[in-house]
């Protein structure tokens, strides 16, 4: 395997897969179980999350399904409680196609409320419990829920956001209300669960909303069951004796779909954490005797940034699954913490395809068997470029390109609740009349043997000196500097220049001081000239979404200038390094005088 830019690219060869195949074949029973459950389900079949869970409860009734602190719930008890919850919802008029808003923090009740909702044939609208004000009102408006189940201390946020009770929030129940009403409700499997078809909608999952109001993406039972087969059966390949730890919020698909489906596939245990804490993470993993965990975003980097402890390897984890383990820290992470297998994947809540690292190849998002295309794109619009005949242009073999995913009967695009927003994501008549493709908005780099690596979001990539700059590449270079704890990169405009110049916001490690010459040596040693960040802003902390993605929009809008209160530096050249910002610098860049060398 060959690498460049600190491991950002790996060439996958046949020998790499052949040497890893025996390990995959050893897990054939788990793979087959997932395939039988998920891949054989057809959209019109009577297969659903509720019926699959009922099947597992009948098979594995005495196994522990959920752990949360000192609480434990078996598959049998969880199914009975979910049935009682479903009866409570049905008594309030919830039926097929209705929406139940769920605004709950991580706990067994959240999983049970989801199961109860889908057993009714209804749709679980998984709300981000951090939302307030206009954003919460917007999300509630999209759901138009018949019933809203909320934490008792979050009910006031619903009232204060201005949502109309009857139109937007429906019948508001606290989780304590549901539990109280459920004590006298029937525990038998509801008939409504058997009437649900795989093509029916199971969840609404909200996008992170980094560039505006969140959109509600649609997750059908069919797609969730396919996720069970892919992530649970082919990816994690858990055994019934395994415990999967997840501290990710259950309103996110990595928890609700990847973690929950993988556990249910094998009759394994899901250990829920209240929230992510870098300092407590391994202690909680050890306390739960977890053998696997799910991650997202920068979680792995946060764990690496913690001081080394004797407990770093005092765990039983053998496999982890998620997206966002950066290539530049992959080897350091797996070596320090003794993680034998990384099931990195690429997917999107609204997407219709996925890559998954089945073979444990380092520094890759894995393989996808789906019909895909890597194409040329317009950086300003995010749209694929078309040739003189109006057809989309594929990139040369091995070159990074915008990822398109074919939309067809076997690979449908469920989209958003907003049909206009859904249509904007589709590319029609791309390669021939009548075809249809989903525009992922992501640049991916093919690696061979069906594998690919994530490069950047199109909204983050910028163009400078006629070249496309991937922010992930620049962030990897900056992060290799020993003083940098965390960073995010974005493009900013400079008058009388084309494109956008690179700017970074960084946080420093505890006790470290900014060294402009040393940082310049780092970036010059790792990056081509057009990718060098010209501005560096030293901040106390970086804002993130609740799923650990950097919020760049505000930083990009603030850009640079004398009104920035944080320490701000500019790149003078390879010898002078980064020096304090001065007002003439942007003009010097436009005239080609800076950076020198």
Curated annotation (Swiss-Prot):
GO cellular component: a single term: plasma membrane
PROSITE patterns on file: AMP_BINDING
Organism domain of life: Bacteria
Protein keywords: ATP-binding, Fatty acid metabolism, Ligase, Lipid metabolism, Nucleotide-binding
Disulfide bonds: none
Inducing factors: Expression is significantly increased during in vitro dormancy (at protein level).
GO BP terms: long-chain fatty acid import into cell; long-chain fatty acid metabolic process
GO terms assigned for molecular function: ATP binding; long-chain fatty acid transmembrane transporter activity; long-chain fatty acid-CoA ligase activity; medium-chain fatty acid-CoA ligase activity
Phenotypic effect of disruption: Deletion mutant displays a diminished ability to synthesize acyl-coenzyme A in cell-free extracts. Deletion of the gene results in a significant decrease in the accumulation of intracellular triacylglycerol (TAG) in Mycobacterium under dormancy-inducing conditions in vitro.
Catalytic activity: a medium-chain fatty acid + ATP + CoA = a medium-chain fatty acyl-CoA + AMP + diphosphate; a long-chain fatty acid + ATP + CoA = a long-chain fatty acyl-CoA + AMP + diphosphate; hexanoate + ATP + CoA = hexanoyl-CoA + AMP + diphosphate; octanoate + ATP + CoA = octanoyl-CoA + AMP + diphosphate
This enzyme's EC code(s): 6.2.1.2, 6.2.1.3
Top-level EC class as recorded in UniProt: ligase
Gene3D superfamilies per record: 3.30.300.30, N-terminal domain of ligase-like
Signal peptide interval: none
Protein family per UniProt: Belongs to the ATP-dependent AMP-binding enzyme family.
Miscellaneous note of the record: Stimulates fatty acid uptake in E.coli cells.
Protein function: Catalyzes the activation of medium/long-chain fatty acids as acyl-coenzyme A (acyl-CoA). May play a role in the uptake of fatty acids by trapping them metabolically as CoA esters. May also play an important role in the channeling of fatty acids into triacylglycerol (TAG) for use by Mycobacterium during its dormancy.
Protein's name in the database: Medium/long-chain-fatty-acid--CoA ligase FadD6
The species this protein was found in: Mycobacterium tuberculosis (strain ATCC 25618 / H37Rv)
Gene symbol of the encoding locus: fadD6
